[in-house]
Amino acid sequence: MLIQAVTIFPEMFDSITRYGVTGRANRQGIWQFEAVNPRKFADNRLGYIDDRPFGGGPGMIMMAPPLHAAIEHAKAQSSQTAKVIYLSPQGKPLTHQKAAELAELTHLILLCGRYEGIDERLLQSSVDEEISIGDFVVSGGELPAMMLMDAVLRLVPGILGDIQSAEQDSFSSGILDCPHYTKPLEFQGMAVPEVLRSGNHGLIAEWRLEQSLRRTLERRPDLLEKRVLIPKESRLLNKILQEQREIQS
């Protein structure tokens, strides 16, 4: 997979290309990265790529021509069809399902905005999709782009050492992940649940599913409203709800 970022701050991406599982996979050649600086495509010797907005208003707007040229340059680096994504609070929310869809692609171009935004004509002519990481605003698109990259890359075969790590993550199954424990057996008076030390894989799997359902019900009940439960999940969820009713009565 080739991922390119159109950004005026290429150095920010060192954190994802050099460190952790994504950095290791990058060194192994499982995925490639290129930062494309639109300043190199500016039509002035100072590299200005922004100007005042028509109609007035605060801040500056990133101009369409240098961004368009940067995107076209990025597309030309691969024979594969590229999907151009603009990281924007106005986009559709990034979900696990969307990350899984993007992980199937071979070439992504991530457009990282700055200042007050980007000329709308560039978005209409060159961007395939706008994606948001949440209902809040940050200073630029670089951090959202890296969050999207990390979410996508961990689903690419070969990047995680154990594919089960991705399969057991929160949202991969549509519900939140279960609690996890490691040594020591006791910490500040809290012991590791006995079932996890039993060696009974069937009981452990059922306990983990029950805890996932319990945590999802407490923290993200909206996920359960959208989910079609299998019989085992229905049984465990009914058990949890019955326990809650008994506590309240």
Curated annotation (Swiss-Prot):
Which GO biological process annotations does it have? tRNA N1-guanine methylation
Q: Cite the EC number.
A: 2.1.1.228
**Pfam families in the record, alphabetically?**
tRNA_m1G_MT
Subcellular localization is given as: Cytoplasm
Alphabetically list the UniProt keywords: Cytoplasm, Methyltransferase, S-adenosyl-L-methionine, Transferase, tRNA processing
Q: Which GO terms describe its cellular component?
A: cytosol
What Gene3D superfamilies does the annotation carry?
3.40.1280.10, tRNA(m1g37)methyltransferase, domain 2
Q: What InterPro entries does the entry give? A: Alpha/beta_knot_MTases, tRNA_m1G_MeTrfase_C_sf, tRNA_m1G_MeTrfase_TrmD, tRNA_m1G_MTases_N, tRNA_MeTrfase_TRMD/TRM10
Chief place of localization: cytoplasm
Q: Which GO terms describe its molecular function?
A: tRNA (guanine(37)-N1)-methyltransferase activity
Q: Which residues form a coiled coil?
A: none
Q: Which residues are recorded as binding S-adenosyl-L-methionine?
A: 113, 133-138
Describe the reaction catalysed, as an equation: guanosine(37) in tRNA + S-adenosyl-L-methionine = N(1)-methylguanosine(37) in tRNA + S-adenosyl-L-homocysteine + H(+)
Q: Is Cytoplasm one of the keywords UniProt gives this record?
A: yes
Key word Ribonucleoprotein present in the record? no
Biological function: Specifically methylates guanosine-37 in various tRNAs.
Q: Which family does it belong to?
A: Belongs to the RNA methyltransferase TrmD family.
Task: Share what the entry says about its subunit structure, partners included.
Answer: Homodimer.
Record's HAMAP family? Answer: TrmD (MF_00605)
State what protein this is by name: tRNA (guanine-N(1)-)-methyltransferase
Origin organism of this chain? Neisseria gonorrhoeae (strain ATCC 700825 / FA 1090)
